[in-house]
Amino acid sequence: MKKFAPAAGFAVALMASMPWTASAQGAACGFRGSLDDAYCDENRDMVADVPREASRLRDPSTLVFAYTPVEDPALYASQFRPLLEYLTTCTGKRTVYFQVTSNAAQVEAMRSGRLHIAGFSTGPTAFAVNLAGAVPFAIKGGPESFESYRVVTIVRADSNIQTLADLKGRRVAHTSATSNSGNLAPRAFFPGLGLTPDTDYRVVYSGGHDRSVMGVNAGDYDAAPVASDVYNRMIGRGQVRRENFRVIWESDPFPTSSFALAHDLRPELAQRIRQCFYDYRFPEAMRRDLGGNDRFWPANYAEHWAPVRAVADAVNAPYNRAAFDAESRRELEAEQRRNQQRQQQQQAPAAAPAAPRVQ
């Protein structure tokens, strides 16, 4: 199956070369709420309306799908292959995987019309809705209900950190500025518990939940707030061992990643894709890789993402273009730093053999 791999910084470069302008629909729109000027929300359901003009509806011969890069993006190309093969048969349209390296790149890919279906992580879902015309329609889950997750703050099992108060003066990994569980929720909840990020402890952006978990495991960070579903999947795959960690705090549940459609797909095609998702049952390997989930449940953005928007409101982090541009720059800078670190690590053995690590 063909994969597309955009270069690091793709979102920032593309935004610089392609201004975001209001569409004809935007100019005639009576209400758009929090949506960008390119979209309209006259029915006030908080997501972009289907364009009124038939000429603006899309019916692509190939459907392009991407999943949020909360872990190594290459993992998902394999995990979602059965779904894409099924969608190819179910919709009658070839469906391919588009590998993205950042949340910003994924949002911009849908905004620019090159992405038709996407799984967005919890926080960036709101950016995708407001800025890219994404319409969430499904959440993965099990036989009883859709999946939720908690923010868990993890430390090494052998650490002397026992409570959030012990994080004062420490080095704590947050994932990225737009992440609900990896940044916004801790900033909303921790001050009420006597701990203020950036003031009481140093925030270091790791670039992803898996990187935060691995960094705590390696001793690079003293603690990290991460999404419980990612943490548990990493344990299930054997990437880390549960007994090497302790959870010192957890939140109430949040919805997990959304699956969304581009707002301007031909309505008959959009409905067909929705029904294909709802009818699908995950094969065994996919169930195992995705935490035991076996199906997709209908999602309603206005209802199910209300707790996420409340967290963003609490920390004055609006899901608008200014915030998105700032996060895009941060993601690019963080990726550049990680690339430099990798280059330094690759060059280090040539200068001097590394000392054996004492366990």
Question: Predicted segment positions?
Answer:
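An extracytoplasmic/periplasmic, membrane-proximal ligand-sensing/linker region
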Residues: Q25-Y67, E71-D72, Y76, L261, ...
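Short beta-strand->loop
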Residues: V135-F146, Y201-R202, G236-P253
